[in-house]
């Protein structure tokens, strides 16, 4: 009797993560954009400066039947999507998709992969510079969409347009730049892409 009860209670619990994963994967499409709250050392400063919960992002691709996130970390790479999700705070994420997904034809998706491939293995850009020597997460997504699809997800801002007043932000700026803060540097933030009217939400946890 106890064995039957244990099976009745425990089996559904063991199957829940698998079922949840399957539901997410059934909703995904190549080229979707995924956001989460990073637990990195700089995440809090990004959130304060941009006034957004979301401090990290990437592009979703399917490879050999499995889903990955193409992301700018150290270095730029493909990460299995469930590893990527669990790396974020509390396993929370939001997936967004182009409002007009028909734009992402097979040819455009091939161009997106090709555009992203030139960044593979490049170091993460701690200084948020707009050149391609190093790359940060939202810069990677923005440049891939711009080059391959001609779409600008969110508007570029100069560094001075962010809220740089919080002590945690000022400390991170001093750590990175010293006294020479590049206030005119063009930047694309995760929040700018998250708020883009070209995207619609399709999943979250």
Where in the sequence are the language-model features?
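Generic N-terminal leader/processing signal
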Residues: 1-2, 16
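Sec-dependent signal peptide recognition
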Residues: 3-11
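Cysteine-nucleophile amide-bond enzymes
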Residues: 16-205
